[in-house]
């Protein structure tokens, strides 16, 4: 298996009380190190890794899974277990073999909190 794509997976859950964006750095294969340049998506937008959350796929939380967005947001304090949704036109979630198990990466435009039950838009 190379990878499995889950097009309907969009949910993430807070695993820390602080949720924040950090820039995704470019990895230089020859130097075997990260350089100061920030990675971009296929549309040229800068990528941000969201720290403090884990992807949820088929009701399973992928601790250590990565969540990446293109819209930066200021750090926020939330209760552990708070659910968010990765939103945007091109949200993807993929699961792949990794050392010692499975890895997971979810990417999209932004992180939003889902509406609460009974809330109207």
Where do the language-model regions lie?
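OB-fold and OB-like single-stranded nucleic-acid-recognition modules
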Residues: 1-121
């Amino acid at each position: 298996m190379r990878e499995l794509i889950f097009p309907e997976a969009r949910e993430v859950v807070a695993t820390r009380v602080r949720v924040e964006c950090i820039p995704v750095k470019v990895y230089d294969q020859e130097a075997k190190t990260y350089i100061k340049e920030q990675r971009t998506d296929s549309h040229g937008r800068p990528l941000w890794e969201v720290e403090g959350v884990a992807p949820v796929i088929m009701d399973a939380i992928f601790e250590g899974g990565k969540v990446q967005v293109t819209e930066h947001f200021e750090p926020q304090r939330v209760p552990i277990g708070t659910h968010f949704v990765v939103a945007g036109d091109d949200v993807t979630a993929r699961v792949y073999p990794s050392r010692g198990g499975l890895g997971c990466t979810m990417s999209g435009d932004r992180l939003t909190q889902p509406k609460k039950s009974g809330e109207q838009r």
